[in-house]
From Swiss-Prot:
Pfam family, one: UQ_con
Function: Catalyzes the covalent attachment of ubiquitin to other proteins. Mediates the selective degradation of short-lived and abnormal proteins.
Record GO cellular component, one term: nucleus
InterPro entries, alphabetized: UBQ-conjugat_E2_core, UBQ-conjugating_AS, UBQ-conjugating_enzyme/RWD
Listed GO MF terms: ATP binding; ubiquitin conjugating enzyme activity
UniProt entry keywords in alphabetical sequence: ATP-binding, Nucleotide-binding, Transferase, Ubl conjugation pathway
Taxonomic source organism: Solanum lycopersicum
Lineage: Eukaryota, Viridiplantae, Streptophyta, Embryophyta, Tracheophyta
UniProt key word Nucleotide-binding: yes
The protein, known as: Ubiquitin-conjugating enzyme E2-17 kDa
GO biological process, one term: protein polyubiquitination
Length: 148
């Protein structure tokens, strides 16, 4: 079941890729993908290229994929291990969701962080109290880690 669904999603992604994202299997392993997300232009991540790993569980799509940033990113909802705090990857997951929708949600999280549900409270605090410092730091991390 899972491999059939994953294959269908891969075909759909290749046919109609989400804006500024791409994804596909690593080597021949259909259950392990790598995705690339371009930093949204209207965010401090603009110009950055972020690598994201995707691991599908054997019971996908009934369980969510494990998605993590491989590129360091300064963000209240993404920690230093690359873990992402995103409701659709946890309790809001539904089998109707696709990797394409997950990637789009991650892109919008880059544009609009959710400081009220942070994974990194210090960054969330900075985002709320000193937006300029947050944006400067996020921009410098993007230049340092996500621009080749």
């Amino acid at each position: 079941m899972a491999s059939k669904r994953i294959l269908k999603e891969l075909k759909d992604l290749q046919k109609d890729p989400p804006t500024s994202c791409s994804a596909g299997p690593v080597a021949e392993d259909m259950f392990h993908w790598q995705a690339t997300i371009m930093g949204p232009t209207d965010s401090p991540y603009a110009g950055g290229v972020f690598l994201v790993s995707i691991h599908f569980p054997p019971d996908y799509p009934f369980k969510p994929p494990k998605v993590a940033f491989r590129t360091k990113v300064f963000h209240p909802n993404i920690n230093s291990n690359g873990s992402i705090c995103l409701d659709i990857l946890k309790e809001q997951w539904s089998p109707a969701l696709t990797i394409s929708k997950v990637l789009l949600s991650i892109c919008s999280l880059l544009t609009d962080p959710n400081p009220d549900d942070p994974l990194v409270p210090e960054i969330a605090h900075m985002y709320k109290t000193d937006r300029a410092k947050y944006e400067t730091t996020a921009r410098s991390w993007t230049q340092k880690y996500a621009m080749g």
